[in-house]
Amino acid sequence: MSKVKIIIVTQTYPPRTGGMQSVMQGLAKKLSEFYKVIVLPDHLVPKKEKSKNSALEIKTFPLPKFLRNFYKKIYIKKVIRKDTLLICDSWKSVFAIPINIKNKIIVLAHGQEYLDPRKIDKINLALSRASILISNSSFTKNLAKNVLNGSKLKHIVIPPTYFMDKSPARFKKTKNIIPNLLTLTRIDIRKGITQTMEALSILKKQKKIKEFTWHIAGSGPELDNLKKLSHLLDLKKEIKFNGWVNDFEKNKLFKKSDIFVMPSYKYKSSIEGFGIVYVEAAKYGIP
């Protein structure tokens, strides 16, 4: 095996869906254009999801939670070199790195992992080993700063847009007679989909809005509730639930959409630290 330059220690990775998964995959692919990269996710990654690039290797750890970090430590000790850089998807993954490792550790910050006050001591313990903390936004940086107990850790902001395709050929949009709305996200409470449905239902009853189509793409715990709500609000004709979509289907939805809808808000200990999908929509010129 060629000399390992970067090890990415992560809890999650595609085919699991979400912004963090996309960010970790994009980071791994981009870095593997220049360095040998090994990705260590917690779960199985099917062969079709693995890169054909020989510089990018994925080693999975589909084990009970209490064993994952133990076996990741053993593996890291086996492959690490003096100049290997370690990148963690969050402070939680620092605990999967052997304690005697002196290599540089970069930790990514996404937002909601800094909301639980019960974890402040654990967060500070993990980040005491980090060289750099990279937040996805100034908002996330301030969240992390509030729990860092005056730490002098180098802390910077880099928006996670580095993996996005720049091809202008994908930006050609179709023209619609009927307005086409799009929501593309993990379907949970804080995405504001329920409130949007209720608002559209009121506008429809008051005849302040005519025909429209709303595609809701994604999966998650609120999907069944939203399907029931669309019937209760008499929106079953207008709303199309697409379920999980692959990149090809996602691009098709973006191309034919006029408005992107996702009024996300803080719910309990869950927030939108950055919201990469807003940038994807903007890339297609969708307000």
Segment roles from a protein language model:
Residues I7-V9, I134, K173-K191, M197-I202, ...:
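Conserved donor-binding/catalytic core segment of Leloir-type glycosyltransferases
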Residues T10-T17, S22-L67, K145, K154:
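N-terminal strand-loop element at the rim of the active site
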Residues R16, S93-F95, I105-D121, S131-I132:
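A short, histidine- and acid-enriched strand-loop-helix "catalytic/donor-clamping" loop
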Residues I87-S93:
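Short His-centered aromatic/hydrophobic patch
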Residues L127, W244-V245, K252-S257:
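Short alpha-helical donor nucleotide-sugar binding micro-motif in glycosyltransferases
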Residues S128-P168, F241:
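Donor nucleotide-sugar binding/catalytic pocket of nucleotide-sugar-dependent glycosyltransferases
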Residues H215, D224-F248:
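Nucleotide-activated donor-binding/catalytic signature segment of Leloir-type glycosyltransferases, i.e.
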Residues K255-S270, I286:
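Acidic donor-binding loop of glycosyltransferase active sites
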